[in-house]
A protein has these predicted regions:
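Alpha-helical transmembrane segments in multi-pass membrane proteins
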Residues: 18-62, 81, 227-235
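Transmembrane helix-loop-helix hairpins at the membrane interface
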Residues: 125-291
């Protein structure tokens, strides 16, 4: 009887995860359509499409499920090699996108054209959004909730599914294969280290590197298939492979007595109130911009 109840609960959690995943992907697609017509705070999209579903899945829809979140501490060696992996991931990702773009007869939008010459305040805003908010909400949803909720289907299958959902959440483009591979890497890191911090660190530093390259004007060195660009990125690919190998091989910190995060109901309410406060603040700021 007990085994049957556990099985039933697992099916409910799996269905909930799939439902929230569909909602997140649909919300991301709708947000891209709205953002193309109406100026909206970029961090609000990540919050509503991924942060809110993660919170619903971890706290409400099936009760408190924080034990799904991999929360083992990282060792200094892991942190170092993971940080280098995130920074150097720009090389294989941009090279793959350019090769696929060339095969398709066109190139992707150059990094240098996106935000080159941006003022420092704009750079800081981009860094806060792309290197903090977006990785936090996306990793919390995909690697923190969905990957744990679907673990009963096997690590490899779930990693492939989560990576595909992660790639589709960014839209259909020449970057889709690269985003899928990045999703696989982030899933593998979370599984190997037993810590969501690993995928969060790599994701955040990868995004931060893209922003800094774009704003500094150095993004031109990572675009196109010129000899210099290809040579530079091929060397970077070698360094990326080495850093990734060391990150997987590095020994983790000693695990704590309890695996998973544990919050009291009062802490959960405070967290929910904080999240809702952020949502209201973003909505009010947008409303004030429209009115004034």
């Amino acid at each position: 009887m007990k085994r049957r109840k556990l099985s039933a609960r697992r099916r409910v959690r799996t269905g909930s995860a799939l439902f929230l995943c569909v909602c997140a992907l649909a919300g991301a697609a709708l947000w891209r359509m709205l953002a193309a017509r109406v100026t909206m705070p970029p961090e609000m999209g990540a919050l509503l499409c991924f942060g809110l579903p993660a919170m619903i899945g971890l706290f409400f829809i099936d009760g408190i499920q924080l034990r799904l979140v991999p929360s083992r501490a990282l060792s200094p060696a892991q942190t170092l090699w993971l940080a280098l992996t995130g920074v150097l991931a720009v090389c294989p990702m941009t090279l793959l996108a350019d090769v696929l773009g060339a095969l398709a007869g066109r190139f992707t939008l150059p990094l240098a054209a996106a935000t080159a010459g941006a003022v420092p305040t704009a750079v800081l805003k981009l860094l806060v959004n792309d290197a903090l908010f977006v990785p936090l909400f996306e990793e919390g949803f995909f690697r923190g909730y969905v990957q744990g909720a679907l673990a009963c289907y096997g690590e490899k299958r779930v990693a492939a599914f989560v990576a595909l959902a992660f790639a589709l959440a960014h839209g259909l483009s020449m970057n889709l294969p690269g985003l899928f591979l990045m999703g696989l890497l982030l899933c593998a890191l979370a599984l190997r280290t037993g810590s969501l911090l690993s995928s969060l660190l790599v994701h955040g530093l990868y995004n931060a590197t893209l922003v800094l390259l774009s704003c500094s004007g150095l993004g031109a060195l990572f675009d196109g298939l010129t000899p210099l660009s290809c040579l530079l990125r091929l060397l970077g690919c070698g360094a990326f492979a080495y850093a990734m190998r060391r990150a997987f091989a590095a020994k983790g910190a000693l695990p704590s007595q309890e695996s998973g995060l544990h919050l009291e109901h009062r802490d959960m309410l405070w967290l929910g109130a904080a999240l809702m406060s952020v949502v209201l603040a973003l909505l009010l700021s947008r409303l004030m911009e429209v009115l004034l």
